[in-house]
Swiss-Prot record:
May interact with TEKT2. InterPro entries: CCDC172 (IPR029618). It is found in: Cytoplasm; Cell projection, Cilium. The gene is Ccdc172. It comes from Rattus norvegicus (Rat). GO terms for cellular component: cytoplasm; sperm midpiece. Residues 13-191 form a coiled coil. Keywords: Cell projection, Coiled coil, Cytoplasm. Detected in spermatozoa (at protein level). Predominantly expressed in testis and in spermatozoa from the caput and corpus epididymis. Transmembrane segments: none annotated. This is Coiled-coil domain-containing protein 172. Belongs to the CCDC172 family.
């Protein structure tokens, strides 16, 4: 080998060593940025976990409250049915009493009229009979007033049932919203798992290649550029493992290059 060839080989070797050091500096810079991203992603993940746990707790509490409301609603519905049945029974009894009272009143008036016609009772006796009739009518009016009070009470209970049904609808809507948010979180988790599996496969491919292959460095840079904007902990962790592996392989190579240059 001539001196000129040897000199060109030395220059080429130095150029390769300088290029390797430059790539190493870039990789270390990317490592620092990735570590920052990992730290931020970890903090964000912890915050999201805390929020999710809080939402799950709220969801459990509201589910428990919803079950209580369902139990209360069923009890009120049974009570309302019983009240409606009792109201119908009382109305029927009231109608029967009114009908019976009307018949008795008509029969009583007829008997009084016949008695007066037969025995010519004085007007004072007529007044006493009329007073008795008024007392009976007043008693019937009191009974009717009591029935109207019971009907108003049943209407009030029906209003409470409507308010509970409205509250139930609001809780069901909130439950549906929480279920949608939980589905979104599960989809994100599934996507992160798929990306992690892909990176594991890529890591196996890298280990099968020669550890000093510059193509590994270029591929790693492309992977870092591709995922450096991602905000997922699994991606950053996989890239960190690859970078550490390449760094541990390339660092011992520099002293060998320096020894070659000195020889």
């Amino acid at each position: 080998m001539s001196l000129e060839s040897l000199f060109q080989h030395i220059i080429f070797t130095e150029h390769q060593a300088e290029e390797s050091r430059r790539v190493m500096r870039e990789v270390r810079s990317e490592i620092a940025r990735c570590r920052g991203k990992i730290k931020k992603a970890t903090e964000d993940l912890n915050e999201e976990k805390i929020k999710l746990e809080s939402k799950v707790q709220q969801f459990s509490e509201k589910t428990f409250l919803l079950e209580l409301l369902k139990t209360r609603e069923n009890a009120l519905e049974r009570q309302c049915s019983a009240i409606v049945s009792e109201r119908d029974r009382l109305l029927q009894a009231c109608e029967a009493i009114k009908k019976k009272t009307t018949e008795q009143e008509e029969r009583f008036i007829k008997e009084i009229t016949d008695f007066n016609d037969n025995y010519e009772i004085t007007k004072k006796r007529d007044a006493l009979m009329e007073e008795d009739i008024k007392l009976e009518m007043a008693d019937l009016e009191n009974q009717a007033e009591a029935l109207r009070g019971e009907m108003k009470s049943m209407e009030y209970n029906s209003g409470q049932l409507q308010e509970l049904q409205k509250l139930k609808s609001e809780l069901l809507q909130e439950l549906f919203t929480l279920q949608k948010k939980l589905k979104v979180l599960k989809d994100e988790e599934t996507e992160a798992i798929c990306i992690t599996k892909h990176l594991e496969a890529e890591k196996i491919k890298i280990r099968e290649k020669p550890q000093h292959d510059p193509e590994c460095v270029r591929r790693l840079k492309r992977e870092l550029d591709l995922y450096k904007e991602e905000d997922m902990e699994s991606v950053c962790r996989a890239l960190q493992i690859e970078v550490d592996l390449l760094e541990s392989t390339l660092v011992p190579k520099d002293p060998q290059d320096n020894n070659s240059l000195s020889r």
